[in-house]
Amino acid sequence: MRRFFLIIFALAALGALAWGVFVEPFRIEVTHTYIEGQVARPLKIAHLSDLHSARVGRRETRLLELLDEEQPDVIIITGDTLTSGFNYQRIKPVLSRLHAPLGVWLVRGNWENESPMHSEHAFYSQLNIHFLLNEAAPIRPDVWLAGLDDPSSGTPNLDAALNMVPPGVYTILAFHAPGFFTQAAGRAPLALAGHTHGGQIRFPFLPVLWLPRDSGHFLEGWYGANGSKMYVSRGIGTSTLPIRFMCRPELAIITIGP
């Protein structure tokens, strides 16, 4: 009997491993949220994070299909587009396929800082991507985006970015590591972050096995403090291990309405 249960356990473990490697990492979940804000008209945001991509593969193809279905006004990427060991040229085919009427906007993650590149603005500009590094720019006249360096591996300068924002406009903060929200809360109505992968590998009734540094106590989804809201994306890709279990990749659609 004991041998029988060991065999059943081994088969279940192999099945879970196969699911985590070959199935779940490609089952991108689209989440929808509507929030109120002082905007002139609704703004539909596609929030992406942690693509960890090196080619247009199965997961990237599915992401592009979903973006085409959702038709967001703007795409905001909160860092970690690449994966360790891959250079920037290999993510060009992925990033060049991202399009939205109000543009694609990107901030650094820890992988970008650990793989430094000269002339980042020029590189992303040729892909029609707006790269923000401790600076702000208008998505449209009534909505500005302030993009920060990665808090976990760089030098974010919140004051420098927000000083560029004119008074009276709706401001979105974008940064990679969500632990920075403890400093940023109260400075803008909405913040977007990633970095955590939602835990990436999770089991029922057990705490999260691993979170990267500077995640704070933030895992995934919505958080609030001092009048600000933050959304933490589970991300698209994987890192360290090519596995997701009970933690599907995510395309977050956030609509801000008046």
Feature locations, PLM:
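Binuclear metal-dependent hydrolase catalytic cores centered on His/Asp/Glu-rich metal-binding motifs
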Residues: 113, 119-129, 133-136, 140-175, ...
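Active-site-proximal beta-strand elements of phosphoester/diester hydrolases
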Residues: 42-52, 142-150, 172-175, 229-234
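Mobile, glycine- and charge-enriched loop segments
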Residues: 23-57, 164-169, 178
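Conserved beta-sheet core of the metallophosphoesterase superfamily
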Residues: 178-253
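N-terminal membrane-anchoring alpha-helices
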Residues: 1-39
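Membrane-embedded segments
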Residues: 39-135
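Catalytic metal-binding/acid-base residues of hydrolase active sites
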Residues: 52, 82, 111-112, 136-137, ...
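Conserved acidic residues
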Residues: 73-75, 102, 169-172, 189
